[in-house]
């Protein structure tokens, strides 16, 4: 019969590294960020504050990122030619957990959003389709789960704005 001598992650294996209350390391960290210090006018401070708003041909997506998901993560009702502003707030508070953001078909580069920060980007979809968005900066063992989709409908479509948020 074999005895387990040690249950410990190997180098580069982060599965066990995320079960620690921030209060245990706060005094040892070089930098932490309080969400209350984020003064960006487009910031949201919780997943429940996320939303998608249409004003004519302009759509504002107020989104959050945290290991290992975006909220909202599935968005419908965007139309070809809309000016879509994605306002992404990184809800992480420890300095070393940035999140990236890119959409297939972006005409500009990705965003890199540091903990506690909000960054915005403009996207104008040029064709109908389903466009994946994803995190471009490795953040945790479930990094590949950080993705979602935007469905773009034809101009004048009756598809209403809809999106997923936590219950």
What kind of region is each of these model predictions?
Residues 73-76, 108-112, 122:
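Beta-strand-rich interaction surfaces with strong enrichment in secreted/lumenal proteins
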Residues 66-68, 83, 89-93, 106, ...:
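Solvent-exposed coil/turn segments that connect beta secondary-structure elements
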Residues 2-8, 12-25, 33-35, 40-55, ...:
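Extracellular/periplasmic metallocenter environments
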Residues 32-38, 72, 84-85, 99-102:
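Short acidic/polar alpha-helix capping motifs at helix-coil junctions
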Residues 63-65, 78, 88, 103, ...:
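Hydrophobic residues in beta-strands and at strand termini
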Residues 27-32, 60-63:
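Long, charged N-terminal interaction/targeting segments
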Residues 51-83:
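N-terminal edge beta-strand
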């Amino acid at each position: 019969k074999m005895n387990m001598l040690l249950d410990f992650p190997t180098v580069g294996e982060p599965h066990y590294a995320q079960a620690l209350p921030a209060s245990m390391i706060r005094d040892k960290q070089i930098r932490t960020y309080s969400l209350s210090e984020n003064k960006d006018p487009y910031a949201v401070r919780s997943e429940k504050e996320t939303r998608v708003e249409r004003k004519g041909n302009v759509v504002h997506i107020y989104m959050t990122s945290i290991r290992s998901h975006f909220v909202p993560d599935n968005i419908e009702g965007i139309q070809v030619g809309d000016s879509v502003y994605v306002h992404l707030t990184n809800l992480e508070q420890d300095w070393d957990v940035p999140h990236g953001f890119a959409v297939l078909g972006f005409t500009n580069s990705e965003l890199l959003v540091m903990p506690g920060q909000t960054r915005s980007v403009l996207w104008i979809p040029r064709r109908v389709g389903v466009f994946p968005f994803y995190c471009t900066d490795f953040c945790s063992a479930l990094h590949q789960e950080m993705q979602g989709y935007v469905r773009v409908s034809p101009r004048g479509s009756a598809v209403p704005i809809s999106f997923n948020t936590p219950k």
